[in-house]
């Protein structure tokens, strides 16, 4: 039975511990957080919006590489219910070291404009006194 990780996500970006970062940078901490609770060969269901988008640069691929396990990622918006109802997930397997390193860099580069967009949105939705709407 696969273990499930549920996180907010966007293409190439994952929210973990109340901050957004590239899937590449967040995948090692996500992998460490489940290392002690399951068999090292079990699949991981990565229930996170857009976790499969980006193919080899996707957040699901980053988690597969970091954990050494197969990861099921999802295209577009997803939640626990829709993830259990359909077979829209795609399985990502850990890559060889060279490919994993290239894709790690690609994910980090592709996440930059998305993170910039989040920063601008936050900036534009702040009141002058610093409170967020």
UniProtKB/Swiss-Prot annotation:
GO terms for cellular component: extracellular region; host cell cytoplasm. The keyword Nucleotide-binding does not apply. Signal peptide: none annotated. The keyword Secreted applies. Its main location: secreted. It comes from the Bacteria. It is found in: Secreted; Host cytoplasm. Keywords: Host cytoplasm, Secreted, Virulence. Effector proteins function to alter host cell physiology and promote bacterial survival in host tissues. This is Secreted effector protein SteB. The lineage of its organism: Bacteria, Pseudomonadati, Pseudomonadota, Gammaproteobacteria, Enterobacterales.
